[in-house]
């Protein structure tokens, strides 16, 4: 061997290794899945390169994965004829945490980067140390000599040019020196089970070096000759008996051979009716590395002008980073005529369906397709359209089973709502899949379709209210009149509802109307209309006084027909943001604050003329327009209405002081001085009054 070079692991790798050795995975068996997966990636890469340059396969024309357990030396060896690694790859990728995965490789290749190994091993490689105390990696890349990497995970590793070992031709050989307590991974049965469990659907042959014992019948004198030599003496026996024994003599012969473990042809090439639920589950797990089974599967083929086969899975739970845009989703693998081309192919499926996993195998795409040409590819656009259509069908199939759909909806309702926001073609379909709690649904959730069937006679609109939580909206003042009249109101309490409902606008010809915005019109009898007019007249004076006190805090103050019990509420404009949307936008750290100016619409204060507080306030205001307590009460009512209507307070301290003053009044505590009122502006301000009158005229 030539000179040995020693390199220190990067600090994070050391941490990672101690993490892996101590806590990383409890089920150590996954190391084999990870290493086979790495081999499969390396084979994908060389196959991809060979599509444009056949000579790349000269070093080793066969593509395979070999596994050799050696009980004599307690080693497990994994050999693949993949792309291999150069010396630089070895140092970089097995010394620092590398970016694993075909995606970066494809992108770099498309960008004209050097096609030598780019990040073959991710964290998966280090999982070898779950079972091994020492790992030796021998590797040969087309562009470099053969090198050996070795480490006992003690903070450093060595790299040496391999002059003594066998020539690999091309590829990588990993020898794992197993720990004393991990020798089960040398057992043929255990290894076969593991490969079947995790790597059954790897598209390259995985062969295991197995012992085979065969019984041979020996009828000649060979056996006897051997015995004679060994014992040095011959027993005299009956001739006949000897002949008889010679005929029957059986001897066990032990030999080794390769045994192919993954005999299945790709699952998507088989007929759906032939495939069992267990086979789909095994395929899903090998595809996604999920430890749970899938929730639903759709296996179909499209024929005609365009041919492709696909298997799509919906997982049981959403990944914790579902909406993490920085992380590349590993969702749909793209094959062309059984040749793996790339994973996480963004162009195959819209972002809002990124939770759907699966594979697509096209007969029509060119084999040398790159990410750049993908975007312009017409075939891919048709495939994408078909996939979305099939996903929608799959969701409707899940919806037939209530229990399954509840699981699905809990995990992926945000995606459906995002679909409504982004996909105008399928908007109506997605709307059918929505489920909401409502004033009449109890603990169950209701669909828009069911809501429509329960609509009252003469009801033309679907009513909804948005808010922070079900608890927050259940007793909202906005619902009082609607409940009294027996209308059902949907609770939309997911932040994304604000966006999706902004796009949906209607369902089956019925307009979606917010209970918290202007323009809520409820059917009224002639008597009710007449009564309303009288009350408007009666309270006109109070409305003006309140507008003067509140100034530009509100656009106008009017007599309400939507509140029944509460004294008042604050309503937003029909096309502006609701209180809930305002809250959501304020919570966004990187928001564009210029937009808030014109989208957070002016509030209208609606007062309830039948509420005793309002009636008393009217009497006081009529008696003395400048009554100090009227002003205090109006401001207090406004601030309380802000809270009950879902807005946030601009000045919580002032509100607190007002409440404290009311408490003192209630407890008959005298104010010691007028200091407490000093911060309250005077009620009568001639300029403000004039301004207020102008506003009235505008209104």
Swiss-Prot record:
SUPFAM superfamilies: ATPase domain of HSP90 chaperone/DNA topoisomerase II/histidine kinase, HSP90 C-terminal domain, Ribosomal protein S5 domain 2-like. ATP binds at residues 38, 80, 125, 371. The keyword Zinc does not apply. GO terms for cellular component: cytosol; perinuclear region of cytoplasm; plasma membrane; protein-containing complex. GO terms for biological process: cellular response to heat; protein folding; protein stabilization. Residues 219-228, 672-690 have a biased composition (Acidic residues). It is found in: Cytoplasm. It comes from the Eukaryota. Pfam families: HATPase_c_3, HSP90. Residues 219-248, 672-699 are annotated as: Disordered. SMART domains: HATPase_c. Most abundantly expressed in roots and apical shoots. Low expression in mature leaves. One of its GO terms (molecular function) is unfolded protein binding. Induction: Heat treatment increases expression 3-fold in mature leaves. Has little effect on developing shoot apices. Keywords: ATP-binding, Chaperone, Cytoplasm, Nucleotide-binding, Stress response. A motif (TPR repeat-binding) lies at residues 695-699. The TPR repeat-binding motif mediates interaction with TPR repeat-containing proteins. Homodimer. Belongs to the heat shock protein 90 family. Molecular chaperone that promotes the maturation, structural maintenance and proper regulation of specific target proteins involved for instance in cell cycle control and signal transduction. Undergoes a functional cycle that is linked to its ATPase activity. This cycle probably induces conformational changes in the client proteins, thereby causing their activation. Interacts dynamically with various co-chaperones that modulate its substrate recognition, ATPase cycle and chaperone function. This is Heat shock cognate protein 80. It comes from Solanum lycopersicum. The gene is HSC80.
């Amino acid at each position: 061997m030539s000179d040995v070079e020693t390199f220190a692991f990067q600090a994070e790798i050391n941490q990672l290794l101690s993490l892996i050795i101590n806590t990383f995975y409890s089920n150590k068996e996954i190391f084999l899945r990870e290493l086979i997966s790495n081999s499969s990636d390396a084979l994908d890469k060389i196959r991809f390169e060979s599509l444009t340059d056949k000579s790349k396969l000269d070093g080793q024309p066969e593509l395979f994965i070999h596994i050799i357990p050696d009980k004599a030396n307690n080693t497990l060896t994994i050999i693949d004829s993949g792309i291999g690694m150069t010396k630089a790859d070895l140092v970089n990728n097995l010394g620092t945490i590398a970016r694993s995965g075909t995606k970066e490789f494809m992108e770099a290749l498309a960008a004209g980067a050097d096609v030598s190994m780019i990040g073959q091993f991710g964290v998966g490689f280090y999982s070898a140390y779950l079972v091994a105390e020492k790992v030796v990696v021998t590797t040969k890349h087309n562009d470099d000599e053969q090198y050996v990497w070795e480490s006992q995970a003690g903070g450093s590793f060595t790299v040496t040019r391999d002059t003594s070992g066998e020539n690999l031709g091309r590829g990588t050989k990993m020898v794992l020196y197993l720990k004393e307590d991990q020798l089960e991974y040398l057992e043929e049965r255990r290894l076969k089970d593991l490969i079947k469990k995790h790597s059954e659907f790897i598209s390259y042959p995985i062969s295991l070096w197995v012992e085979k014992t065969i019984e041979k019948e020996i009828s000649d004198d060979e056996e006897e000759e051997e015995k004679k030599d060994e014992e040095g003496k011959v027993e005299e026996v009956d001739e006949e008996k000897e002949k008889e024994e010679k005929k029957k003599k059986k001897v066990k012969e032990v030999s080794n051979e390769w045994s192919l473990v993954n005999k299945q042809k790709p699952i998507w090439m088989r007929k759906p009716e032939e495939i069992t639920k267990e086979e789909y589950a095994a395929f899903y797990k090998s595809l996604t590395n999920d430890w749970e089974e899938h929730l639903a599967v759709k296996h179909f083929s499209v024929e005609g002008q365009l041919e492709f086969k696909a298997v799509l899975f919906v997982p049981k739970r959403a990944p914790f980073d579902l909406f993490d845009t920085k992380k590349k989703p590993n969702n749909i693998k793209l094959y062309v005529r059984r040749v793996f081309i790339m994973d996480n192919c963004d162009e195959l499926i819209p972002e809002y369906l990124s939770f759907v996993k699966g594979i697509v195998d096209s007969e029509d795409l060119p084999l040398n397709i790159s990410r750049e040409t993908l975007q312009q590819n017409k075939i891919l656009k048709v495939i994408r359209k078909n996939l979305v259509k099939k996903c929608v069908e799959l969701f409707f199939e899940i919806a037939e089973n209530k229990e399954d759909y509840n699981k699905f909806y809990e995990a992926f309702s945000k995606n459906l709502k995002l679909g409504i926001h982004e996909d105008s073609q399928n908007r109506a379909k997605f709307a059918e899949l929505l489920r909401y709690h409502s004033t009449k649904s109890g603990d169950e959730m209701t669909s828009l379709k069911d809501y429509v069937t329960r609509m009252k006679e003469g009801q033309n609109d679907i009513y909804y209210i948005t808010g922070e939580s079900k608890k927050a909206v259940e007793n909202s003042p906005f619902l009082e009149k609607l409940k009294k009249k027996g209308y059902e109101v949907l609770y939309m309490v997911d932040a994304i509802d604000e966006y999706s409902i902004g796009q949906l606008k209607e369902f089956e010809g019925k307009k979606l109307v917010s209970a918290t915005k202007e323009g809520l019109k409820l059917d009224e009898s002639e008597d009710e209309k007449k009564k309303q007019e009288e009350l408007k007249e009666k309270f006109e004076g109070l409305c003006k006084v309140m507008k003067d006190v509140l100034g530009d805090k509100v656009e106008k103050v009017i007599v309400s027909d939507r509140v029944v019990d509460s004294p008042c509420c604050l309503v937003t404009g029909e096309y502006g943001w609701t209180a809930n949307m305002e809250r959501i936008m304020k919570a966004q750290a990187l928001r564009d604050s210029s937009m808030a100016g014109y989208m957070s619409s002016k509030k209208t204060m609606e007062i309830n003329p039948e509420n005793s507080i309002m009636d008393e306030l009217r009497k006081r205001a009529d008696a003395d327009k400048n009554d100090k307590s009227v002003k205090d009460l109006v401001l207090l009512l406004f601030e309380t209405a802000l809270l009950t209507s879902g807005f946030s307070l601009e000045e919580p301290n002032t509100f607190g002081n007002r409440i404290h003053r009311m408490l003192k009044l209630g407890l008959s505590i005298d104010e010691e001085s007028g200091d407490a009122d000093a911060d309250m502006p005077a009620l009568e301000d001639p300029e403000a009054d004039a301004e207020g009158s102008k506003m009235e005229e505008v209104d």
